[in-house]
């Protein structure tokens, strides 16, 4: 069964969350329970709790960065859920990218700000709509997971060409805007957009690009950390966790491709 989401409003509904599809069906609280807590291996559960625990420790020692910490926690939930092929990743993603856009603005990382505000925010809605049409039962039939697929060699070449052209143009624009790190910022933004498109289209190779993006973004926030102090530390650690998750995401999506090939 596939589910849709027309609203994120949850307050005032004590027993059941009603999120209607066009067909008139609803998404129950029981569905959310299965989606959020079902289908995890022991390793994945420990993996997620470890990531969240690290962010909690950072917040305890650096409470002034609470906004960045919330962005980091919801971002971690988002990418881990993407790695599992869970459609609920888009709820956490919406919260994270909205906050991250504001934090990026305060650090004058305008490329990151525009990427999150103008691309990632609307993409959460587009991605949910695209994924809901291509969901299948998971390995244990306990939860749903997205039907993943793989790029051909020709498609890979097109992805690389588009990334190179887009990066060259965007870096020039960031120079004119006075971005703090136009080259690094520009490469990160363009490759991120391409990776996001591959994610929406359910391609496994998004994770190869996310690995590149996360390495670049770690460099970007490391510079911000040295210049501006501890307020950027939660986001720096968030991208270190993203990098680890990207490797695991590629491995897990390879399994999804094999499991749902031909469907």
Curated annotation (Swiss-Prot):
Pfam families: NMN_transporter (PF04973). Its main location: membrane. It comes from Neisseria mucosa (strain ATCC 25996 / DSM 4631 / NCTC 10774 / M26). Required for nicotinamide riboside transport across the inner membrane. Homotrimer. The keyword Cell inner membrane applies. It comes from the Bacteria. This is Nicotinamide riboside transporter PnuC. One of its GO terms (cellular component) is membrane. Belongs to the nicotinamide ribonucleoside (NR) uptake permease (TC 4.B.1) family. Residues 1-40, 84-86, 132-155, 202-205, 254-263 are cytoplasmic. Keywords: Cell inner membrane, Cell membrane, Membrane, NAD, Transmembrane, Transmembrane helix, Transport.
């Amino acid at each position: 069964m596939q589910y849709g989401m027309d609203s994120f409003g949850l307050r005032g509904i004590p027993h059941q969350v009603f999120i209607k599809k066009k067909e008139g069906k609803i998404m129950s609280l029981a569905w959310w329970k299965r989606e959020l807590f079902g289908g995890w291996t022991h390793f994945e559960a420990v993996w997620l709790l470890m990531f969240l625990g690290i962010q909690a420790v950072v917040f305890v020692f650096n409470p002034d960065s609470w906004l960045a910490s919330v962005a980091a926690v919801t971002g971690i939930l988002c990418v881990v859920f993407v790695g599992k092929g869970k459609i609920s990743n888009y709820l956490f993603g919406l919260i994270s990218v909205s906050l991250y856009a504001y934090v990026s603005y305060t650090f004058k990382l305008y490329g990151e700000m525009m990427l999150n505000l103008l691309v990632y925010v609307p993409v959460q809605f587009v991605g949910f709509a695209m994924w809901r049409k291509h969901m299948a039962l998971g390995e244990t039939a306990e939860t749903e997971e997205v039907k993943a697929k793989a790029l051909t060699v020709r498609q890979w070449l097109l992805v690389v060409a588009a990334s190179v052209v887009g990066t060259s143009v965007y870096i020039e624009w960031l120079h004119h805007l006075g971005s703090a790190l136009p080259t690094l910022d520009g490469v990160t933004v363009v490759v991120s957009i391409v990776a996001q498109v591959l994610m929406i289209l359910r391609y496994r190779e998004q994770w190869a690009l996310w690995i590149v993006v996360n390495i670049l973004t770690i460099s970007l926030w490391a510079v911000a950390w040295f210049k501006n102090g501890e307020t950027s530390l939660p986001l720096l650690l968030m991208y270190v966790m993203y990098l680890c998750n990207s490797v695991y995401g590629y491995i897990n999506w390879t399994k999804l491709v094999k499991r749902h090939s031909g469907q």
